[in-house]
Amino acid sequence: MVDVKCLSDYELHKHLMKLGFTPGPILPSTRKTYEKKLVQLLASPPWKPPVMKRPTRPHGSEDSDDSEGMLQDQVQGLSGDVSLKKTTLDATRDPRAAPHTRTPGTTFHARTLRTAFCGRAPRTTSHGA
């Protein structure tokens, strides 16, 4: 086992990186923490990151760019007959929507619209005559 107290800052950094830990700058205030971390990493069994396996499709080419279809296949395979659908925002129910997309028969005053978009009513100033 390596004597961590005798390592230079560079060597300490190199050993930590080799064991899969990315340290910050090694300073007098952080060195003790990194020495302790190196001892922990040396004492524990080697850690291997999990291998991400690409899901296989039972039908069709794996090189296809049809990622949405692939996702639907995965969801159907996991939970039966679930399908994903793209939804759009229903602008007719949004009072802040543009006038041509609002529900017919509703009217908004300019002050209401400014309040909806700016979060507050504008100040009114009276111009002296």
Swiss-Prot record:
Gene3D superfamilies per UniProt = 1.10.720.40
PROSITE patterns hit by this protein: LEM (PS50954)
The UniProt record lists the LEM domain at 1-45
List every stretch annotated Disordered.
45-129
Enumerate composition-biased segments (Basic and acidic residues).
Answer: 83-97
Among SUPFAM superfamilies, the record links this protein to: LEM domain
Q: Name one Pfam family in it.
A: LEM
Under the heading PANTHER family, the entry gives: LAMINA-ASSOCIATED POLYPEPTIDE THYMOPOIETIN, LEM DOMAIN-CONTAINING PROTEIN 1
This protein is called LEM domain-containing protein 1
